[in-house]
Curated annotation (Swiss-Prot):
EC number of this enzyme: 6.1.1.4
Organism from which the protein derives: Streptococcus pneumoniae serotype 2 (strain D39 / NCTC 7466)
Protein name: Leucine--tRNA ligase
BP GO annotations: leucyl-tRNA aminoacylation
Gene responsible for this protein: leuS
GO cellular component, one term: cytosol
């Protein structure tokens, strides 16, 4: 057989690995450890797509490489299985979300195993397993005990069609829900919150210690959004009311000409004049229909309504009209801003729209034309005139503190984490509300609080979850006879994914979240690979929970993930018409190398785009494995380009990778394998070992594969192959194409053992040096020949070789040699007359 028969070889080795538990996590205390973590998937109904294996293959290559280097490797997989899609499916079909989820997990696991990933399945976790979410609930009770989980009446993003509130991050820029594209409205509701803001400074500062890309760290820094400035208190004219504004530029207070409150601000109704009451009420209603993202869009038209009230500027006593506008959010800062239109573009546009005064207080611009947002010396600012920014801020803060109407303040953009969902398919929140007005956490001895099985999982419509309908589960009575009611909200999908990497370390422990010694052994995660779309939320939430557990003494490290790598996106093929509209692939035909719309006949432009069901351009890995084999898919996805680049899927590229594996198969099975080394491949082999080792370490898998191809080309030029080089090459390709490598290893090593723990090959530095070198031969100063000679020949040997060359002999025939100058490793110059 002269080709790689993947249909026979791949299932054979997958069966061997499963039977022998080949990838069971090493426990030899004398070995170093390596923890390679994938972002575990949500097991959807559609199964894996070819984007999933890209990151999984990367961590698998590293895991196989580290095992061969003598490491204990922890490489686990599990399921982020709670969440809206399963519940939505269950409501649409009448099926149990638990059954649907179990079927999906079985399908995902089948697909993953077909790709030959070296997971330790003994450590599999499932966030919907009560033995797992017992500890999710335990963490919540600890947060509650420490005052970091609390209830609050907060305006939430309510989605009527989903029957639940969603987090700000789940609202799209157009004001619809990320899940389903439904309208989102603002609605005040009782919600559970987690006080992530208590950790803001640590979450910010500890980023400096992490081996993450600067772009991801910057996204977290911006999300946390630390600002240093001052709180300034404004009194409302003619009342005993006052409100506080946070500003990073208190030095511009003399230029503040109006103030703006969020429509939801608690003062609005109290200070609104009777003349403005109707306009204010209408505006508040309109604002409630918009998401925070829509409201704060810088490009949108400025809207607002005057309340009829005035604030008093604390530094000059001037009256400032108080407006409400939807670009100010009650949940951000104090829900109030002081507007300095001369030096803030949004304030300037608002002032121009509503004909409000603009007073310049920093010199350097023309504030009639646009806001001047650069720094400058202060003007029109009384005792601040002539000062620079730093001096003016220090002076105004001192003044405000002396007057009792302001103080220095650090704030964060980060909001507390809205933690409750009004849905069924999630972890029950382990809290009981008693009729005497108190609330207590469910004792640890009663955890897990198991999610009750029910067929009626439709939202209650009252803002409570379907659990509110389950009276037997809901109502409890204390030993002293006091009646209570269980919390009906469930946790968000983020909960189980915030700590799953810890449970992999000790997944069957019934007494603790995980054993302290094992946590010390394995933490932090050495490399975490996943999509950049999780750059803020999941990673921030996981870091928050980890720091909390560190404070409890549960985990030994301050941070969970030492190195993070975001793989790029694998794009599908798409087609666009003349308007730029995307056309589904089943509406396209290819004729003479061009693409045409089947229905209209219009010629279409081919371009890469994100794979989607609507475009019918999703590639199923099952189809690829069936036709080309898992090893081909693995090699192709790693060879497409840099791991962090977004690259279009290509059938031609897939075929190229398959042909390469066939060449590898033929090289090892067809060449004569020798016990003696003739030295012909010394340089090529040692270069390949060095390059592949270094490129795997730096996650440059595409260039590692390119070097493997270089070796195959070199080896194919030789008649025979040295056995140690054949073995070493098979080891080098094993992390990329493990099934093929296992099969070839048996033909060369004949041990009957897996290649997985065979020591990684090393290179001989001395063999990397060129053993031949090109020299030039000059006659009367002109180059007449170039010769390949052994390195480091003596002057005499060089001269002898040059004079014996046929070309040189022809040039000097009949001439007298006056002198020969030889420079070793460089040239021979022959002087004749």
């Amino acid at each position: 057989m002269s080709f790689y028969n993947h249909k026979e070889i791949e299932p054979k080795w997958q069966g061997y690995w499963a039977e022998h538990h080949t990838f069971k996590t090493g426990t030899d205390a004398s070995k170093p450890k390596f923890y390679a973590l994938d972002m575990f998937p949500y097991p959807s109904g559609v199964g894996l797509h070819v984007g999933h294996p890209e990151g999984y293959t990367a961590t698998d290559i590293l895991s196989r490489y580290k095992r061969a280097q003598g490491y204990n490797v922890l490489h686990p997989m599990g399921w982020d299985a709670f969440g809206l899609p399963a519940e939505q499916y269950a409501m649409d079909t009448g099926n149990d979300p638990a059954e649907f989820t179990a079927e999906n997990i079985a399908n995902f696991k089948r697909q993953i195993n077909a790709l030959g990933f070296s997971y330790d399945w003994d450590r599999e976790v499932n966030t919907t397993d009560p033995n797992y979410y017992k500890w999710t609930q335990w963490i919540f009770t600890k947060l509650y005990e420490k005052g970091l989980a609390y209830e609050a009446e907060v305006p939430v993003n309510w989605v009527e069609e989903l029957g639940t509130a969603i987090a700000n991050e789940e609202v799209l820029p157009d004001g619809t829900s990320e899940r389903g594209g439904y309208p989102v409205v603002r609605k005040p509701m009782r919600q559970w919150m987690l006080k992530i803001t208590a950790y803001a400074e640590r979450l910010l500062n500890d980023l400096d210690e992490l081996d993450w890309s600067e772009s991801i760290k910057d996204m977290q820094r911006n999300w946390i959004g630390k600002s240093t400035g001052a709180n300034v208190t404004f009194k409302v004219k003619g009342t005993d009311k006052e409100f506080t504004v946070f500003t990073t530029r208190p030095d511009t207070l003399f230029g503040a000409t109006f103030t703006v409150l969020a429509p939801e601000h608690e003062l609005v109704d109290a200070i609104t004049s009777s003349e403005q009451a109707e306009a204010v009420a209408d505006y508040k209603h309109q604002a409630s229909l918009k998401s925070d993202l829509v409201r704060t869009d810088l490009a949108k038209e400025k809207t607002g309504v005057w309340t009829g009230a005035y604030a008093i500027n604390p530094v000059n006593g001037k009256e400032m009209p108080i407006w409400i506008a939807d670009y100010v959010l009650a949940s951000y800062g104090t829900g109030a801003v002081m507007a300095v239109p001369a030096h803030d573009q949004r304030d300037w546009e608002f002032a121009k729209q509503f004909d409000l005064p603009i007073v310049e207080v920093l010199e350097g611009g023309n504030v009639e034309e646009a806001a001047y947002t650069e720094d400058g010396l202060h003007v029109n600012s009384d005792f601040l005139d002539g000062l620079n920014k730093e001096d003016a801020i220090a002076k105004i803060v001192a003044c405000l503190e002396e007057k009792g109407c302001g103080q220095e303040k650090v704030t964060y953009r980060l909001r507390d984490w809205l933690f409750s969902r009004q849905r069924y398919w999630g972890e029950p929140i382990p809290i009981i509300h008693w009729e005497d007005g108190t609330s207590t956490a469910v004792p640890e001895t009663e955890l897990p609080l198991v999610l009750p099985v029910t067929k009626d999982i439709r939202p209650s419509g009252t803002g409570e979850s379907p659990l509110a309908n389950l009276t037997d589960w809901l109502e409890v009575t204390r030993e002293d006879g006091v009646k209570g009611r269980r919390e009906t909200n469930t946790m968000p999908q983020w909960a189980g994914s915030s700590w799953y990497y810890l449970r992999y370390i000790d997944p069957h422990n019934t007494e603790k979240l995980a054993d302290e010694d094992l946590l010390k052994q394995w933490l932090p995660v050495d490399i975490y690979v996943g999509g950049a779309e999780h750059a803020v939320l999941h990673l921030l939430y996981a870091r928050f929970w980890h720091k909390f557990l560190y404070d409890l003494g549960v985990v030994p490290t301050k941070e969970p993930f030492q190195k993070l790598f975001n793989q790029g996106m694998i794009l599908g093929t798409s087609y666009r018409d003349h308007r730029g509209a995307l056309v589904a692939t089943d509406k396209v035909e290819k004729r003479d190398g061009s693409f045409f719309h089947i229905e209209t006949g219009e010629e279409l432009e081919q371009a890469p785009a994100k794979m989607s069901k609507s475009l019918k351009n999703v590639v199923n890995p099952d189809d690829v494995v069936e036709q080309y084999g898992a090893d081909t898919l693995r090699v192709y996805e790693m060879f497409m380009g840099p791991l962090d680049a977004s690259i279009a899927w290509s059938e031609e590229g897939l075929e190229g990778s398959r042909k390469f594996l066939d060449r590898v198969y033929r090289l090892i099975t067809s060449k004569e394998i020798l016990a003696e080394n003739n030295g012909a491949l010394d340089k090529a082999y040692n270069e390949t070992v060095k390059a592949v080792t270094e490129q795997i370490e730096s996650l440059k898998f595409n260039t590692a594969i390119a070097q493997l191809m270089v070796f195959v080309n070199a080896a194919n030029k030789e008649d025979k192959l040295y056995v140690d080089y054949a073995k070493g090459f098979i080891q080098l390709i094993a992390p990329f194409a493990p099934h093929l490598a296992e099969e070839l290893w048996q033909t060369v090593a004949e041990t009957g053992e897996s290649i997985s723990y065979v020591a990684w090959p090393t290179w001989d530095e001395s063999k990397l040096v060129e053993d031949e070198i090109e020299i030039v031969v000059q006659i009367k100063g002109k180059v007449r020949a170039k010769l390949m000679v052994a390195k480091d020949l003596s002057r005499e040997e060089l001269q002898e070789i040059a004079l014996a060359d046929e070309k040189v002999k022809a040039e000097i025939d009949g001439k007298e040699i006056v002198k020969v100058i030889s420079v070793p490793n460089k040239l021979v110059n022959i002087v004749v007359k």
